[in-house]
Design a protein with these regions (language model features):
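Alpha-helical membrane-protein topology signature
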Residues: 1-179
Length: 179
């Protein structure tokens, strides 16, 4: 495929991802948040695929699997075992190391750090705790997005960061004075 066409397709997919991700940070139900996580990560993996961001694509696909697993735990009103979280984190690190070695690009490690924050956000049972860890996730994605020329995903991740903070203020009472 022509690189310019792939670039524009990726940016278009990223716009859809961004809208969904920003809305997701304002949701109260962890179950609905997990459904949005599945969808946004499917779109994000497609975007990174078109931009040849191997690690970003792998991490996003693993995030889909992780979100599905966490969704089933949530539907049973059970907290996931820490072993499940540790396995996903190990898979993220392995995918990042693989991508880094095959591409000889240390930037490919950043998605693994973002994914660790992602897993820590998903093992939370309350949406307020989810938002705390979800706020850290874009901090690692932002430089990776610039490196892979995923400019719309950069805007998406910046929007997620801002929306997370707004959600923490609006829904979780961040900065409210205690009476």
């Amino acid at each position: 495929m022509d690189p310019q066409v792939a670039f524009f397709i990726a940016q278009g997919i990223s716009v859809i991802t961004g809208i969904m991700a920003i809305v997701m940070m304002q949701l109260k139900s962890m179950r609905v948040i997990l459904i949005f996580q599945i969808l946004t990560n499917l779109f994000a993996s497609s975007s990174y695929l078109f931009l040849d961001g191997k690690s970003g694509m792998l991490v996003s696909l693993l995030a889909v699997v992780c979100s599905v697993v966490m969704y089933f735990y949530n539907t049973k009103n059970r907290k996931p075992h820490l072993l499940v979280a540790a396995l996903f984190i190990a898979a993220y690190v392995a995918s990042a190391v693989y991508s880094t070695v095959t591409s000889n690009d240390p930037w490919e490690l950043l998605p693994a750090f973002a994914a660790t924050c992602f897993v820590l956000s998903l093992i939370q049972t309350k949406a307020s705790y989810f938002r705390i860890f979800a706020t850290l996730n874009p901090v690692f994605w932002l430089p990776y997005d610039l490196h892979t020329a995923s400019y719309v995903m950069f805007i998406v991740h910046f929007g997620i960061l801002v929306s997370s903070v707004i959600g923490m203020i609006r829904l979780d009472g961040l900065f409210r004075k205690k009476k």
